[in-house]
Amino acid sequence: MSRELMVQDSGDTIGNTPLVLLRNISKGLDARIAVKVEYLNPSCSVKDRIAKSMVDEAEKAGTIVPGKTVLVEGTSGNLGIALAHIGKIRGYKVILVMPATMSVERRAMLRAYGAEVILSDPAEGHPGVIKKVEMLVDKLPNAHCLDQFSNPANPAAHYRTTGPEIWRQTEGKVDIVCFGVGSSGTVTGVGRYLREQNPNIEIYPVEPYESSVLSGLPRGPHKIQGIGAGIVPGNVDRSLFTEILRIKSDDAMQMARRLADEEAILGGISSGANVVAAVELASRPENKGKLIVTTVNSFAERYFTTELYSDVLNEVSQLTFSSDDEAMGIAKKYLGL
């Protein structure tokens, strides 16, 4: 929906996010990199698109009913927040199960939207989350799981919205896309749409180096919240893939900080992973002159208690009020005077 018009509720503002060139990070590279700033969706992540799509389709099918159905979902955080947001608008009780390693900010946002949060043992990984979700759905009255990992309404959201937006915003000149794989909705939905427009477009899924399940390697611990669930999602369409890119957690975090410092774009860790992948692709000689598009998936504010911004949080937590002389000293130090 157009953001130029007044809307009925905040759910109507989902989508039509801007596409921004990375002018500084791409300096010295022979390809251009642009990012869809998905944290400008109402609950501040790309997952707003699929939460609305899955709820819409389930309502049309009569599978869920506002005011009656309890939505129970496993999440690393962003889908849960998006589902809590749309649930609040539509009148659903929402229960989210997430690993205990996910950030405190995510838990707080879920509670702020009125959802219930249940933590699972991180050692059990995604299977542990699913086991808890299945137990709750089985034993709670009127409970239903939308299951983002295998729900076709997930990639369909990106096929209907994100893909066409990228095609329109680049005037059909996009050559390459790369997206982190959590539930696989973005890479599958966008990939399908763009391949229909141009069969030569290259599509690169991105996964954590430390947990490269898509690549056929064992599941392992990593720091890139939101991708690398340790399973191959049902929504994966390998026929679309040009090549799977494996990105290290530390590289993803460093790039997320660079995005803030060099581009004034505050994305999370998976956003950093996407841009690391885009830079890797832009560095390849065969991609000279090409346009590479990826996403900034979520806003950095929900990562301040994680390793990504813990140094900043610790620093500002220790600030105290200053005298005029101290204030001048702080200002001069900041300005290098």
UniProtKB/Swiss-Prot annotation:
Record's catalysed reaction(s): O-acetyl-L-serine + hydrogen sulfide = L-cysteine + acetate
Enzyme Commission numbers on file: 2.5.1.47
Enzyme class: transferase
Location of N6-(pyridoxal phosphate)lysine modifications: 47
Pathways involved: Amino-acid biosynthesis; L-cysteine biosynthesis; L-cysteine from L-serine: step 2/2
Record-linked CDD domains: CBS_like
A single GO BP: cysteine biosynthetic process from serine
Keyword annotations of the record: Amino-acid biosynthesis, Cysteine biosynthesis, Pyridoxal phosphate, Transferase
InterPro entries associated with the record: Cys_synth, Cys_Synth/Cystath_Beta-Synth, CysK, P-phosphate_BS, TrpB-like_PALP, TrpB-like_PALP_sf
PROSITE patterns according to UniProt: CYS_SYNTHASE
Annotated GO MF terms: cysteine synthase activity
Keyword Transferase appears in the UniProt entry: yes
Listed cofactors: pyridoxal 5'-phosphate
GO cellular component terms attached to this protein's record: cytoplasm
Residues involved in pyridoxal 5'-phosphate binding: 78, 182-186, 270
Family: Belongs to the cysteine synthase/cystathionine beta-synthase family.
Role of this protein: Primarily catalyzes the formation of cysteine and acetate from O-acetylserine and hydrogen sulfide. Can also catalyze the formation of cysteine and acetate from S-sulfocysteine and hydrogen sulfide and the formation of cyanoalanine and hydrogen sulfide from either S-sulfocysteine or O-acetylserine and hydrogen cyanide.
Oligomeric form and interacting partners: Homodimer.
Protein name: Cysteine synthase 3
Gene (name only): cysl-3
